[in-house]
């Protein structure tokens, strides 16, 4: 009987979070949170790991204690500042102690500069219910960076409040080199001192006083560059990171003689990105939004030639009229099996024609992959390298077809 009860208990998941939050004057607040997960099987249940900003563990029977202090921006002032410090002690995580967030933000009117490691959300999607964006989701630990941005939509001049813009430019550094070295254990490549770059631009056409329709368009691009790549045979590939290379990453271009042969032929670094679009309609008591995102690894994925409609994340978000059951419903379809075609080929004297394909999403020949601390930075439905048993930091299952549904609500005021 005891064995049977233990089996039933271990097959069920027990998630026991407890949090204390308090707020002081001028936006200063703190939080203390603890969580424990007990489960059967080999790993923690997927949705207790994914989209937690890396504050989770795939190892079953894990726990953490999280404490943080934050100051929020004062949005009613032209100039404001914010900061945050969040530290975690954990059991059966990739680290026993780590800093989850440490940042300072300065904002003047609509412009902001942010320095440090900060959790950020998805673009055009519901952070609570979406499976996650293709380039940047909420799945991995924050990357420390210096980020200059227009973080929220602001009206573009002379458009009578119809046109709105936002965007950012950032440079930073990955912090998981010791984890990579431990995880690979000499079985596959890993990198040290890898640098990070991202940029994005978004445009929204909306004036709800005159029309219930809104349209959003955007592009996000990111790159890994610099650092050293260590191979199992002892080879070390050192990649350039001069000031000129920072510009080569911002304006994607070939590497110079100090770069690898591949980066001299192609583009310096590992580049990823996505196009996004959304159309919304606001009814008097509810609203609906359809969105689309296409991921790309290189030029073949960026052009219309290879069918941007084939590999994409499409979704529908419905915010319902006030009711005691369901507030918001999100449905999504993800497809990544095309990848610009079956193979990649450069023209030769024998065959004077090039074929671009086999994009191998989230992977790269020099860098570990589009991951941080083993968790994919993009959509978590593409299985993260931390699940690999062979010490490989590549995304081994990146051709995916999946459906996702999420909903939230407040059926009782007691919750």
Please name every model-derived segment.
Residues 34-42, 71-73, 87-91, 108-110, ...:
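Transmembrane beta-strands of outer-membrane beta-barrel pores
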Residues 121-232:
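Internal, well-ordered domain-core segments that constitute the primary functional module
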Residues 258-415:
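Outer-membrane beta-barrel pore domains
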Residues 65-71, 102-108, 115, 146-152, ...:
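Residues on the lipid-exposed face of transmembrane beta-strands in outer-membrane beta-barrel proteins
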Residues 57-65, 96-100, 139-149, 193-199, ...:
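Residues that define the transmembrane beta-barrel architecture of outer-membrane proteins
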């Amino acid at each position: 009987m005891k064995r049977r009860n233990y089996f039933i208990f271990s097959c069920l998941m027990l998630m026991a979070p407890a949090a204390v939050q308090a707020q002081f004057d001028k936006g200063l607040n703190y939080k203390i949170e603890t969580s424990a997960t007990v489960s059967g099987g080999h790993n923690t249940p997927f949705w207790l790991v994914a989209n937690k900003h890396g504050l989770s563990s795939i190892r079953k029977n894990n726990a953490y204690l999280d404490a943080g202090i934050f100051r929020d921006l004062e949005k009613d002032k032209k100039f404001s500042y914010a900061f945050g410090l969040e530290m975690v002690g954990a059991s059966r995580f990739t680290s026993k102690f780590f800093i989850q967030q440490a940042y300072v933000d300065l904002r003047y009117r609509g412009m902001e500069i942010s320095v440090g490691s900060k959790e950020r959300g998805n673009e055009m999607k519901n952070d609570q219910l979406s499976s996650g964006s293709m380039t940047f989701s909420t799945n991995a630990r924050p990357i420390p960076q210096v980020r200059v941005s227009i973080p929220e939509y602001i009206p573009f001049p002379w458009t009578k409040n119809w046109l709105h813009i936002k965007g950012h430019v950032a440079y930073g550094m990955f912090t998981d080199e010791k984890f990579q070295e431990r995880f690979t254990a000499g079985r596959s490549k890993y990198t040290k001192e890898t640098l990070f770059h991202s940029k994005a631009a978004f445009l929204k056409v909306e004036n709800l006083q005159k029309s219930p329709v809104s349209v959003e368009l955007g592009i996000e691009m990111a790159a890994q560059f610099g650092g050293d790549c260590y191979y199992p045979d002892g080879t070390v590939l050192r990649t350039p990171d001069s000031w000129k290379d920072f510009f080569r990453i911002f304006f994607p271009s070939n590497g110079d003689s100090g770069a690898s042969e591949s980066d001299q032929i192609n583009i310096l670094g590992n580049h990823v990105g996505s196009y996004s679009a959304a159309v919304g309609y606001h009814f008097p008591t509810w609203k609906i939004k359809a969105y689309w995102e296409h991921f790309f690894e290189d030029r073949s994925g960026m052009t219309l030639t290879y069918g941007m409609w084939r590999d994409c994340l499409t979704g529908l978000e419905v915010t319902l009229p006030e009711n005691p059951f369901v507030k918001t419903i999100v449905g999504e379809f993800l497809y990544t099996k095309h990848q610009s075609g079956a193979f990649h080929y450069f023209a030769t004297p024998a065959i004077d024609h090039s074929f671009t394909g086999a994009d191998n999403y989230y992977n790269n020949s020099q860098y570990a992959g589009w991951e941080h601390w083993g968790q994919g930075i993009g959509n978590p439905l593409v299985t993260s390298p931390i699940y690999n048993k062979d010490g490989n930091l590549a995304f081994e299952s990146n051709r995916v077809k999946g459906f996702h549904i999420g909903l939230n609500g407040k059926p009782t005021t007691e919750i």
